[in-house]
Amino acid sequence: MNVTMHSKKLLKPSIPTPNHLQKLNLSLLDQIQIPFYVGLIFHYETLSDNSDITLSKLESSLSETLTLYYHVAGRYNGTDCVIECNDQGIGYVETAFDVELHQFLLGEESNNLDLLVGLSGFLSETETPPLAAIQLNMFKCGGLVIGAQFNHIIGDMFTMSTFMNSWAKACRVGIKEVAHPTFGLAPLMPSAKVLNIPPPPSFEGVKFVSKRFVFNENAITRLRKEATEEDGDGDDDQKKKRPSRVDLVTAFLSKSLIEMDCAKKEQTKSRPSLMVHMMNLRKRTKLALENDVSGNFFIVVNAESKITVAPKITDLTESLGSACGEIISEVAKVDDAEVVSSMVLNSVREFYYEWGKGEKNVFLYTSWCRFPLYEVDFGWGIPSLVDTTAVPFGLIVLMDEAPAGDGIAVRACLSEHDMIQFQQHHQLLSYVS
């Protein structure tokens, strides 16, 4: 397989950013993010016959979209905790693959890196790298794969998916039809000079491997049935609680990882476990904010399970449900931004403390299910597949398996040693494809 790079440049907004918008203050919630790049990959099986026109339209509409999301084309100033919206641009690459898309998909999963390979120079070779980068990959069959990377400092998955849908709409019907983003978090929750939170642990020298596993609808139905049977001696109230598919898959994966931990130590008893999830706070508080506010606006959910011997799936879903329910109940009463900031900081402190201490199993998850990633339509239909890429630490991403249905695709990023055990776990193999 050969990959030809046809274009590599910094793409700037189509018109300059006005002087009064050239500094965007970051919020406290932006400030505390680990500044890594989140990757998104959108597969489109068939485009129009003229790929040159398609690529030109994608480029021009992206440049127009950057006039609304002007901060994305700027640079991060960590000293002042602002984005300097100076129109330096985002990374932009066009490539051509000499194979058909279905052949590419049959290859090794590491090929995902090929879909972003042209962006690596942008993101690593400069002192002030772009905050985002896009790579357009054309295939012999007329298929297109769009790879996107966003620095987490500029926003969460809600913000990233909104940007992609805005770009798609600009390409499909014109920039005038695209809603302007709102930036209301920093005035309410300004950045701080001193954060007083422990740093995340260092994983220098650890090789992480990323693999994709799919729980289709049938597998989730089977998993729910098994969990019910497993808890056959539980009380009636617990049986009435129906965990979400995200909680169910999270609990199953955590159970598998706990069993791996026991096997690694040749013990029947595991350490206590902490399941960590991220919860979108939009529409959950009483703060005077737009429902589609851009930036990072989520809280860390720390769900602890103290059961150290053969935990059941229902034990773990109960821990998740209890932790999530408590936060939902608390934030629903809050109309003070300082209280929200304090809650978020405390959740991050607890997570980083336990993550670094090493006395508990810490399983880090994030769910992108129900985010409109499968609605990113540039004019030739929705993507047939949406995926993500590896990150430099242990993380399990849960995504919708397909445009419709209740299946879940899992992108697991684990250490090389743990991944070998994980993908051979007998129960996991009975559910995933």
UniProtKB/Swiss-Prot annotation:
Entries under InterPro entries matching the protein: CAT-like_dom_sf
Keywords, sorted A to Z: Acyltransferase, Transferase
EC number: 2.3.1.224
Gene3D superfamilies: Chloramphenicol acetyltransferase-like domain (3.30.559.10)
Reactions it catalyzes: benzyl alcohol + acetyl-CoA = benzyl acetate + CoA; (E)-cinnamyl alcohol + acetyl-CoA = (E)-cinnamyl acetate + CoA
Keyword Acetylation on entry: no
Tissue: Expressed in petals, style, sepals and stamens. Very low expression in stigma and not detected in leaves.
Catalytic residues in the record: H152 (proton acceptor), D377 (proton acceptor)
Function: Involved in the biosynthesis of benzyl acetate, a major constituent of the floral scent. Can use benzylalcohol, cinnamylalcohol, 3-cis-hexene-1-ol or heptanol as substrates. Has some activity with 2-phenylethanol and 2-naphtalene-ethanol, but no activity with linalool, 2-hydroxybenzylalcohol, 3-hydroxybenzylalcohol or 4-hydroxybenzylalcohol.
Family: Belongs to the plant acyltransferase family.
UniProt protein name: Acetyl-CoA-benzylalcohol acetyltransferase
Organism: Clarkia breweri
